[in-house]
Amino acid sequence: LMYSLSCLAKLKNWQFIYYTNQISSQAQLNAAGNLAASLAKGMQIILTKTKLNLLAQDLATNLASNQLLIQQGGAQSEAEFGIQQLAAEIRQWAAQQNFAQLAIFLPSGTGTSAFYLQKQLREFTVYTTNCVGSPEYLEQQFQQLDPHTKIYPTILPNLNYRFATPNQELFTAYQQLSD
């Protein structure tokens, strides 16, 4: 999401400020991937000690008419519009392929994409896994996005690892496979 927003901001000549309460020491020393690409597109990053949900509430009350606040992970109802388009494209593709059944998997941070995709594609099964937090966290996020809908993606529990921080066990396995 960060990189996509940085591209849109650059294209539209908008200012893009990214608030976070943590940046791994690895990313601070050597920004790479989406972070480096977003910074290169002009994204400003602000490290804050304030909890992000409290900061978002404060920022939301002081927004000017030409400003937009996007929650971490896009966890807000406006995200459903884009997912409706994605669902239509998936539905069209499935019809072209003559698929009556389809299982869709996507990893989740806040679970927003998986939730709205399952809501839009009730005829298919959407699977997700918790990349941060727990399966219970994802269910809480789903409830916050739409308290009236109980159509949730199927959550496949997962161990999670801190973003941009190498996990020694996985890195060792990667090295062994690379040799």
Annotate each PLM feature.
Residues Q22-Q97, T154-S178:
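Small/polar-residue-rich loop-to-helix segments that shape phosphate-bearing ligand pockets
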Residues Y3-T50, K119, E136-T149:
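Active-site-proximal loop->helix
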Residues L1-L5, G109-L117:
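Short glycine/serine/threonine-rich phosphate/pyrophosphate-binding segments
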Residues T20-Q22, L106-S108, T128-N130:
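Short beta-strand/turn micro-motifs composed of small residues
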Residues L68, A103-I104:
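Structural motif
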Residues L1, K12, Q84-E89, W93-F99, ...:
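Catalytic phosphate/metal-binding cores of nucleic-acid and nucleotide-processing enzymes, i.e., regions
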Residues F124-D179:
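Active-site/ligand-binding loops adjacent to catalytic centers
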